[in-house]
Amino acid sequence: MWRRLIYHPDINYALRQTLVLCLPVAVGLMLGELRFGLLFSLVPACCNIAGLDTPHKRFFKRLIIGASLFATCSLLTQLLLAKDVPLPFLLTGLTLVLGVTAELGPLHAKLLPASLLAAIFTLSLAGYMPVWEPLLIYALGTLWYGLFNWFWFWIWREQPLRESLSLLYRELADYCEAKYSLLTQHTDPEKALPPLLVRQQKAVDLITQCYQQMHMLSAQNNTDYKRMLRIFQEALDLQEHISVSLHQPEEVQKLVERSHAEEVIRWNAQTVAARLRVLADDILYHRLPTRFTIEKQIGALEKIARQHPDNPVGQFCYWHFSRIARVLRTQKPLYARDLLADKQRRMPLLPALKSYLSLKSPALRNAGRLSVMLSVASLMGTALHLPKSYWILMTVLLVTQNGYGATRLRIVNRSVGTVVGLIIAGVALHFKIPEGYTLTLMLITTLASYLILRKNYGWATVGFTITAVYTLQLLWLNGEQYILPRLIDTIIGCLIAFGGTVWLWPQWQSGLLRKNAHDALEAYQDAIRLILSEDPQPTPLAWQRMRVNQAHNTLYNSLNQAMQEPAFNSHYLADMKLWVTHSQFIVEHINAMTTLAREHRALPPELAQEYLQSCEIAIQRCQQRLEYDEPGSSGDANIMDAPEMQPHEGAAGTLEQHLQRVIGHLNTMHTISSMAWRQRPHHGIWLSRKLRDSKA
């Protein structure tokens, strides 16, 4: 029971965040310095945004960099304000200088908002203490935060990685069960595919997250890390075999009518799903896996495959389920590979700076957008005669997310949560609760807020707002005066963030659909080249297969976000949704062909070359249709003719069947692209006649 309690992701996270906040407050209370203990609670907010609690092989180096940036921003803010430098100029300078961190890598990019938040917190402290005290608070607070989290992760043994792996296994279980419960509904892809696409998207996102965590811990050679690496390799093998499909609805229907294949296949899928859920709990709660057998289910599937040798569905399901059963039974990967062959080196500073100084740099545009929003927020504070507009600035910084949909959702949750929290705090302040009870209620509220933070940001904001009001009440006895101004500041900050997201160099996902579709086709082409090569090796095959899945996932995410964006052509998105559906079919065929190529089930060289040329022509036709507008107005561009595969004598092998279906899907995607292009917008990035002109 205690394992399920202490290792539960939400409980473990809430305990860690609450303790790192409240232990300094408790120490300050015992030493008679409650004020400094409460001020220490500002530092974990900056560290969380910077991702300094991420387990990493350079954990302490990142702590030193984070503490240095926090202290430097705090010092510059105080010194420049003392020299009467306007706040908009100060914030613009800090934002544009720190924006280069986004070019170094996604983890480094988190240092920009965290450092700006440290500067904004300094605005609230300036005038109440000497210049050196905020610097000391940030330095000691970051040191405490790092040491506590290092000790916590040392006790719980890679718990964040275990949580991600557990979620991955659980998502694979749901995906496997959902896929084969819709076995007889595959004749209607519009109904059967959307839920499967969502689950496939979640699984690939979790695989990417797990890989990043494995890479950040790659310097460790302890037994626990090696065990997690093996479990991750098993998950990759399971995803490879679960996400394949022949896409032969007619053959499926024939097999279902002639036998009880539907019940047997569903029996296998449910058994596999149940085992995956057990393994997910074992990973999360630090339990050793128990023995597992699936011989009866696999035997029944093998019997159906023998009874119907002319139907490829039975053979296909038996082969892939037997591989899944082997992984689950032996608890070992199907083959050896080097998962960390790609070292993912960060970009050196000088090349990153050169890339950042380009006007087409997304990092520069993001920094420019943020600097304008913060400048407008500070000017708004001046216009309203606010002595310090730090709450407006903080609101803008916290609600601004990567994309229109995420920002809009965060604005709604933040504004509603703040309003409710301020109302509750305003009522509670009238009761004049003693200090001891106040601190106890703040502790309980903080723990409850972190418990629900991951699932409901709005309700968590209610709790954080209440604790913020009482923190000000304990520090400066002005909690009641704080309520109405902070309510107005929150609304102003949310409006500024929304306006900046919509009007300041917006990065609409709808405008990236062409580029992402082009990149996905390029990944498919590289994968097919590797599969049809003379001697494909397991590690390059595994890497390319994941590139294919991630490229399609990026395209699918762009489509989902584009559907939430305002004032976009719904006809174009409907056509692109059908295009993405066929792209998913190709991904599943590539997953299946990867397993065949790894086991050296290759085609004859002449036939392989012929199929490779046909696939490349079909892919390039799709890319050209995405790149140019009309066949007659493409200038010197050559729109290629459709490939015509000559039928070969004898029954086509499994690999050849997959290739034929890939070519069929590509031809359909070319037709869809021709129809979708006529529905495209006629403004902004869409005025570019060629895709390569807009790739930046």
Q: How does the language model describe each region?
A:
Residues 1-15, 22, 26, 30, ...:
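Long, hydrophobic alpha-helical segments that serve as membrane-spanning/inserting helices
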Residues 8, 12-83, 94-100, 115-120:
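N-terminal cofactor/phosphate-binding cores enriched in small/glycine residues
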Residues 23-31, 47-48, 72-80, 94-102, ...:
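Alpha-helical membrane-inserting segments
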Residues 27-42, 76-93, 134-140, 380, ...:
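Structural signature of hydrophobic alpha-helical transmembrane segments
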Residues 31-32, 346-447, 466:
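Core alpha-helical transmembrane segments of integral membrane proteins
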Residues 45-57, 98-105, 399-407, 445-454:
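C-terminal ends of transmembrane helices
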Residues 110-134, 469-486:
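Transmembrane helix-loop junctions at the membrane interface of multipass transporters and ion channels
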Residues 430-571, 580:
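Generic detector of multi-pass transmembrane helix bundles and their immediately adjacent loops
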